[in-house]
UniProtKB/Swiss-Prot annotation:
It catalyses: di-trans,octa-cis-undecaprenyl diphosphate + H2O = di-trans,octa-cis-undecaprenyl phosphate + phosphate + H(+). It comes from the Bacteria. GO terms for cellular component: plasma membrane. PANTHER family: UNDECAPRENYL-DIPHOSPHATASE (PTHR30622:SF4). The gene is uppP. One of its GO terms (molecular function) is undecaprenyl-diphosphatase activity. This is Undecaprenyl-diphosphatase. Catalyzes the dephosphorylation of undecaprenyl diphosphate (UPP). Confers resistance to bacitracin. It comes from Alcanivorax borkumensis (strain ATCC 700651 / DSM 11573 / NCIMB 13689 / SK2). It is found in: Cell inner membrane.
Length: 265
């Protein structure tokens, strides 16, 4: 992989990680369509770290509040809203961990193809449109309970399939339950933190075990470009969300899915 390809892939990761259009699909497609080499474990770790830093910076107040809520709960010996939100994020993370552990090899072997991406892009794009168009959009996260968190967590597990979009499917699930767009996105992005962190740690473990030679300059490029791009993308997405909803992303998914099917025909 050369520097130009690294720059493009870092930009793609930063732009697509938090938009409901599937980052994994957009990272797979350059190798499928353009014949680019695989980005490699080291660069994968770098762009995961970059996007993790971006979402943690944007939601730093929520993260600080959750930690403070845990301390306050111990002191007062009762639950509070901040600790509750943190526990619900942890609970909703479990299905993705379980299904990832059980099905990762099958997914890597059988589902990383342009055809699968085309189908999931269209199907889950349609579900995103339906939940946004017909969801009540009246509840705040204060209403979220165990059942809702598990439902969103199970939806997140589907994002292991390339083309689904982790943010897209979790926002779809939250909208279907009647949550407001901004609250659906907030829970989705908070939910991304343990998932990205876990994926990054696993890849780091593989990196160490395989004794991969690391190009530190290219790693730095991946971290910086993906972090800055991801942060700006989150800012843009949250501001756009209440004004126009999910329609632009649904249209994009429709165009991408149909274009892929024509390319495969």
């Amino acid at each position: 992989m050369d520097w130009f390809q690294a720059l493009v892939l870092a930009l793609i990761q930063g732009l697509t990680e938090f938009l409901p259009i599937s980052s994994s699909a957009h990272l797979i497609l350059p190798s499928q369509i353009l014949g680019w080499p695989d980005q490699g474990l080291a660069f994968d770790v770098a762009v995961h770290l970059g996007t993790l830093l971006a979402v943690m910076m944007y939601y730093r107040r929520d993260l600080i509040a959750m930690v403070g809520g845990a301390g306050l709960a111990v002191q007062q010996r009762r639950m509070n809203d901040d600790l509750k939100l943190g526990l619900l994020v942890a609970l909703a993370t479990i299905p993705a961990v379980v299904f990832g552990f059980l099905g990762d090899d099958f997914i890597e072997r059988e589902l990383r193809s342009a055809l699968v991406i085309a189908i999931t892009t269209l199907v889950f794009g349609a579900l995103l449109w339906a939940s946004d168009a017909f969801g009540k959009r009246e509840f705040s996260l204060a209403r979220l309970g165990v059942a809702g968190a598990i439902f969103i967590g199970l939806a997140q597990a589907l994002a292991l399939i390339p083309g689904t979009s982790r943010s897209g499917i979790t926002i779809t699930a939250a909208l279907a339950l009647g949550y407001r767009r901004e609250d659906a996105a907030r829970f989705s992005f908070l939910l991304s933190i343990p998932v990205i962190l876990g994926a990054g740690l696993l890849k780091t473990k593989d990196l160490i075990e395989q004794q991969v030679v690391v190009d530190w300059g290219m790693m730095a490029l991946g971290v910086i470009v993906s972090a800055v791009t991801a942060y700006l993308t989150i800012v843009f997405f949250i501001r756009l969300l209440e004004r126009v909803g999910m329609l632009p992303f649904v249209v994009y998914r429709l165009i991408l899915g149909v274009a892929l099917l024509f390319w495969l025909a």
